[in-house]
Design a protein with these regions (language model features):
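An anionic, glycine-rich sequence signature occurring as long contiguous blocks
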Residues: 96-172
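Short, ordered loop/turn segments at secondary-structure junctions
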Residues: 50, 80, 102-104
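Short, conserved catalytic/metal-binding motifs centered on acidic residues
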Residues: 15-19, 37, 43, 61, ...
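Electropositive, glycine- and tryptophan-enriched low-complexity nucleic-acid-binding patches
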Residues: 27-72
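Conserved PLP-enzyme active-site core in the AAT-like
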Residues: 58, 67-70, 81, 87-91
């Protein structure tokens, strides 16, 4: 599990995320789209790469991380980057990954959903801020050998429930 200090068992954790810069469009040219590597510990952007479009984020991840030497680092990224080639590239440089599985990997998602999650103990946390209450429940399993994804060691199930809190003294 990742801690607030931005390390997992002493390893640095880097989040990769892409954002389109709002209000930066010039004439007919689309707004710039940037892919950034963020240090979980400090919140600092370590490097960023301009990409031609969102579809180009996948190969841009390698260009982004290459100068950072991902050896020993845990890289987190959204579902767009849940690609076998990306996982192999990170592991091939001695890094580790934590990737989200969604419908862009239908077979992998179906495989993971079929695991015996109801038999797995869970842990939950609750955060309250900005008038919302968010409960996250996490379950973890060792990845079965037959899960077809490079170097997968562990799989997690994260469920999030968000409720809006009523201001005191007001009815909804």
């Amino acid at each position: 599990m990742c801690t607030r200090t931005g390390t997992v068992e002493g390893r640095t954790v880097i989040a990769v995320d892409g954002k389109t810069m709002r209000g930066a469009r010039v004439g007919e040219d689309p707004a710039p789209h940037l892919l950034a590597a963020l240090d979980h510990a400090t919140g600092a952007v370590l490097t960023q790469e301009r990409v031609a479009g969102k579809s180009n984020e996948i190969p841009a991840l390698r260009v982004l991380l290459e100068p950072l030497d991902p050896g020993g680092v845990v890289v987190t990224a959204d579902a767009m980057h849940t690609q076998a080639d990306t996982a192999q590239w990170i592991r091939g440089r001695g890094g580790h990954y934590l990737l989200t599985v969604k419908d862009n990997q239908k077979t992998l998602r179906r495989t993971l959903k079929a695991l015996p999650w109801k038999d797995v103990p869970s842990t939950s946390s609750v955060e309250r801020s900005h008038g919302r209450r968010v409960r996250r429940t996490v379950k973890a399993l060792e990845a079965p050998k037959w899960v077809d994804f490079p170097a997968a060691a562990q799989v997690l199930q994260v469920r999030r429930t968000r409720t809006h809190q009523q201001p005191q003294g007001q009815d909804r």
